[in-house]
A protein has these predicted regions:
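Catalytic core of tubulin tyrosine ligase-like
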Residues: 1-144
Length: 144
């Protein structure tokens, strides 16, 4: 996977986060995609600072992997006053949406845009998926 590093990321309380979105592709022809409404919001555990070119980046500032951040003895996150279910370095989407609403962000409109990106990403991979399905999936209309 290759991704562009965002130098000025959206943060919550100064902490970087990412979204773990669960997607199931049950058919390629016709294309059938399901996006689970609940996911995970995973946090870095130190306040965000832009990386310096001549120094090694602090993984607790820039990475949101639970397997890395669970070892941070100086973890800055435990919960959020605007979300009942926000606890620790992994939140539910429900907790994240509570914080978005508290900041007057239309979570439904945002999630609609996220779904659109997910679908377009899968469509961009469709030629490769089609090839793999032709070789390995006995029934093209049903993956399972």
């Amino acid at each position: 996977m290759v991704s562009h590093y965002i130098a000025n990321p959206l943060t919550i309380d100064g902490l970087k986060f990412d979204l773990r979105i669960y997607v199931a592709i049950t058919s390629i022809n016709p294309l059938r995609i399901y996006i689970y409404e609940e996911g995970l919001v995973r946090f870095a555990t130190q306040l965000y600072q832009p990386p310096l070119i001549d120094s090694e980046a602090d993984p607790y500032v820039h990475l949101t992997n639970y397997s890395i951040n669970k070892h941070n003895n100086k973890c800055l996150i435990a919960g959020h006053e605007m979300a009942e279910e926000a606890d620790g370095i992994k939140w539910s989407f429900k907790a994240w949406k509570q914080v978005l609403k508290a900041h007057q962000v239309n979570d439904e409109k945002l999630f609609s845009k996220i779904k659109d990106i997910v679908v377009k990403t899968i469509i961009s991979c469709e030629p490769n998926l089609n090839s793999a399905f032709e070789m390995y999936v006995p029934h093209r209309s049903n993956c399972f």
